[in-house]
Amino acid sequence: MNNTSKLLNLSNVSYYIGQQRLLSHINIDIAVNETISVIGPNGAGKSTLVKLILGLIEPTSGQVTPSAPLQIGYVPQRFSVPPILPLRVSDLLAQAHKKRLMAEQRQFIFDKLSLTHLLSRQMLHLSGGETQRVLLARALLDKPNLLILDEPMQGLDPETEVWLYQFIDELPEFLRCAMLVVSHDLHWVMKGSRRVICLNKHICCEGQPSELAISSEFQKLFGHHYEQPYVHQPHACEHHAPS
């Protein structure tokens, strides 16, 4: 990979708690505008990897090094609001640094995510799909050059899942950002990803879905169900969030 296109480098990164190994000898380069999907069983170290990239924890050994000024947008796996906190959608979005984006980019996000009618609503009263759209907007309004989505499909209805798949597909081109998507949704990862990293406390295998499907390490974890994965085709049409 050309150094000028590299956004972030993890070099021989390991993380231990006492004698317990959570991650071992992780080497990952994330390029500008690249989309990477991370899969693995429960306890594989996916959440630990995200925390290391976010800088929430320090590696036991190895280095996590940005190759350019890094602005990370993060959509967490879980988000809860205390019942006593009267937090409106507009309050949460006001915390984002909207001045980073041009007016038309901000409007695109609001239109694409169908947010205008939600602005006065309490976060506590939103559905799972509505909450996910608001969290995604908040991350995008910071104009990240790296967007991390942690299990973005969790708890969504099928219609919202389809919309979000399509929206994720369009994001790198629109915002010129890299994306790291952590997902248990093996069907989407193998059909909709260009580069996949399979994690099980170390990197078992990585590459394009067609390469992973014939990997013995992948088949040990997930079986032989993905020997001929669908070739990804970008979506050209406009898609808006379910209202």
Curated annotation (Swiss-Prot):
Protein name from the UniProt record: Zinc import ATP-binding protein ZnuC
Name the reaction it catalyses: Zn(2+)(out) + ATP(in) + H2O(in) = Zn(2+)(in) + ADP(in) + phosphate(in) + H(+)(in)
Assembly, in brief, is: The complex is composed of two ATP-binding proteins (ZnuC), two transmembrane proteins (ZnuB) and a solute-binding protein (ZnuA).
- Keyword set for this entry? ATP-binding, Cell inner membrane, Cell membrane, Ion transport, Membrane, Nucleotide-binding, Translocase, Transport, Zinc, Zinc transport
Localization per Swiss-Prot or TrEMBL: Cell inner membrane
**Species in which this protein is naturally found:** Psychrobacter arcticus (strain DSM 17307 / VKM B-2377 / 273-4)
User: Among its keywords, does the record have ATP-binding?
Assistant: yes
Please name the GO terms of the biological process aspect recorded for this protein, alphabetically: response to zinc ion
Query: Which InterPro entries does the UniProt record give?
Result: AAA+_ATPase, ABC_transporter-like_ATP-bd, Metal_Ion_Import_ABC, P-loop_NTPase
Gene responsible for this protein:
znuC
Family the UniProt entry places it in: Belongs to the ABC transporter superfamily. Zinc importer (TC 3.A.1.15.5) family.
Q: Which GO terms describe its molecular function?
A: ABC-type zinc transporter activity; ATP binding; ATP hydrolysis activity
**Topology relative to the membrane:** Peripheral membrane protein
What is the role of this chain?
Part of the ABC transporter complex ZnuABC involved in zinc import. Responsible for energy coupling to the transport system.
Which Gene Ontology terms of cellular component type are present? plasma membrane
Binding residues for ATP, per the UniProt record? G40, P41, N42, G43, A44, G45, K46, S47
According to its UniProt record, the EC number is 7.2.2.20
Q: Where is the ABC transporter domain?
A: 8-225
